[in-house]
Amino acid sequence: MKKILWIADFSVDEIAGGGELVDAHLLSLLDENYETEFLKASTVTTDTIKQNIDSIFIVSNFVSLSPMVRKYLQNTKYFIVEHDHKYLKTRDPSPFTDLIAPKNVVINRSFYKNAVKVFCQSTKHGEVVEKNLKIDNIISFGSTFWSQDHMNVLEDCATQASLGKTKDRVIIQSTNMVKGQRQAEAYCKDMSLGYELMSDPNYESFIKKLSEYSSLIFLPQVYETFSRLAVEARIVGCSMVGNQNISAAYEPWFKLKGKDLLEQVKKQQAAAESLFLKEVDGVDENYRNVADITVILNMYRRPDNMPMQVSAINKQTIRPKEIWTWVNAHEDNEKFDREKLDVDKIFDNNHNWKFYGRFAGALLADTEYVAIFDDDTIPGDKWFENCLETMKTHEGILGSAGIILKDNVYVKHDRCGWPTQNQEIAEVDLVGHAWFFKREWLQYLWKEKPPTWDNGEDIQFSFMAQKHGGVKTYCPPHPPTDPSLHGSVLGNELGIDSKATSNNNETSHQQFFTERDMVVQNAIKNGWKTVKGVKL
C-alpha cells in the first residue's frame, strides 16, 4: 500500500479554518486506499523526507515548513493544495491590476512549479495562481469540500429557511481583520441599514443562526481562494452584499440559491473528489522527475530563440529546479519583452559581459548541477537524462559539442557531440554550446585570471577544472537514431549566421581564432594535459 504524508501548519483539531476543513476532507478520501499520516509542517526535517523518499507528499499550508525542507521536497513526488496565496509575499493579489502581482512580490515559484500538481479551489483561484506563477501544473476543483455531517446541516437549514426568514441583515463578527467586519459595518452605516453581528464556534449552531437572516453583508479584504461562507449563505437562502474578493462568486453555479445550489454543490464536490483521487492515483504514470539542476540561458543577439529554449527545457524528461536568463546588453535584445519569458530569475545587465558573465551568475545557484546553454542551442527532451546517466560512470564537465585538439592551435581539432553524433561517451579537451557540470566545480574557473575576458571560457573552464580539481571533460552519447538525447537539435539551423561571434563583424574571424589559439597555448604552457598530449 502506498504511503501518503500530508504536511500542513495545523490540523483541523487545532484550527477549524477553511483550509484545515478542506485538508481533513481530502485526507479522509485517501484513507481508504493509502496509508496516510499527518505531519505538522514545523516538525518536518530533511531526515523526515529522506526516510520517506518513496512516499507521496501532499503539502497544504506551509508557512512553518523550513526553506531547506521545501528545497528537498523538490526531489520527491509531491502535490500542493494551495490555500491563501502563499506564492505572494503579501498573501493577497487583490491590490494589483488584474490580480497579477509585480515580480518582486512573487515567491516560492520553484516550489509550486516542481510539484506534480497544484490543486486550487475555485476556478478563479487557479487562474490567478497560473497568471502570477506562469506554470502549467494547476488543477482547479471549481469547488471546496464539506463533510457529510456539514452537508446534512446545510440541507436541514436550507429546508427551514425556505419557510421564511425572521431576521434582516447579518455581519459575521470576527477578530480576523481580513474578514472585513469593520468595512461591512461601515457600509451599513453609510447606507443607513440595520444589521446584527453574529458568531458561533459550533458549525451547526452557526449555520442555523445564519439561515434566520435574509441578507449577509460580507466584504473580505483579501482575495479569497473560495469563500465557503458565501456559498453557505446562499444555500440557506441569504441574499448577499459582497465584493470582488469572493472568488466562488465567479463560478457559473453561484447564481443558484437554496436547495438548487446545494444539489449543484454536491455534484461539483463529487467531481472534484474524483479528480483529486485520479491525480494522486496516477502520480507514478504522470510524474516527471525533478533533478537538482539550475539552468542558465544566455540572451544576446538571438532573443527570439529564447521562448523555444525555455519550451525545450520545460519538456525535459528530467526537469530542472529553476531556469535563469543571463542578458548581455545589445541593441538586438533591447526591445524584447523579458516579462513574457517563463523563467524564474533574470540577470538584466546594462553591459555585455561576454562569455564569462553567465558563469559568474552560476555561482549563485543553490543546486548540485548547473546547465548553461548558448543562445543557439535547443536540447532534445532527454538531454538532462543523458547527462545524469553519463555522470554515473564518467563524472566530469559535460557538453553537447566536444573538441579534441590535434595541435596547439584551436582550429586543428576533431569534433564530437551533435556535429558528428558519437555513439559512446567520449573524453574531450573542452565542450561548448551546452554545458552540464557540478556547481562546486565553478570554483576552479576562478582560481586564476584568464588570459582574456573576451574569448575562450570553454577552454579555460576545462583547463582550470583539470588543473585544480582533477576534473575531466566528456561528451555524452549523441546517437544518430535518437536526437532526444542530443544537447543541440537545431545547431545547424540556428548557429550558423552573422550573429555568431566567430562570424560577425564586431569580432573578425581572424581575431576570434587568434584569441582562442592564445588561450589554448596559455593552458598548455601552464600544465593542461590534452587528450592527444599536444605540446607547444
What are these regions (language model features)?
Residues 1-65, 241-270, 277-297, 307:
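N-terminal pre-catalytic "stem/leader" segment of glycosyltransferase-like enzymes
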Residues 286-291, 305-309, 448-536:
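C-terminal catalytic/acceptor-binding lobe
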Residues 113-138, 182-183:
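A short, active-site helix/loop in glycosyltransferases that binds the activated sugar's phosphate group
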Residues 359-369:
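Active-site nucleotide-sugar/metal-binding loop of Leloir-type enzymes
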Residues 39-116, 124, 305-311, 333-335, ...:
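Extended catalytic core of nucleotide-activated donor transferases of GT-like folds
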Residues 144-206, 302-304:
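Conserved catalytic-core segment of nucleotide-activated headgroup transferases in glycan assembly
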Residues 362, 378-450:
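Conserved catalytic core of nucleotide-sugar-dependent glycosyltransferases
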Residues 311-321:
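Short, acidic, metal-binding catalytic loop of nucleotide-sugar glycosyltransferases
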